[in-house]
């Protein structure tokens, strides 16, 4: 689910996912619930007032980075070229940064909300 950021639609989706995924019934099959980082939205939360995205789990996406960039470029209305936070360059840079935090060439950060072990 999206991390609760400035985008009102992302906040609504986050709240809906939190309600729909409550582990209150027997046999709940959701083993992992994690929030993802959203380029150009997650970093706009007000510092020290609202929670800012801090990943506590980074997945190695080195083998998938080119596919991720290609998929991202399919959403033309969401791209801010050439140097915006929603550019292919920024997506790649964020993957390099998140990967460097965990020893991968490219990584994608998540914040684990709930995990059943």
PLM regions: where:
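Metal-dependent de-N-acetylase/amidase catalytic core
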Residues: 1-117
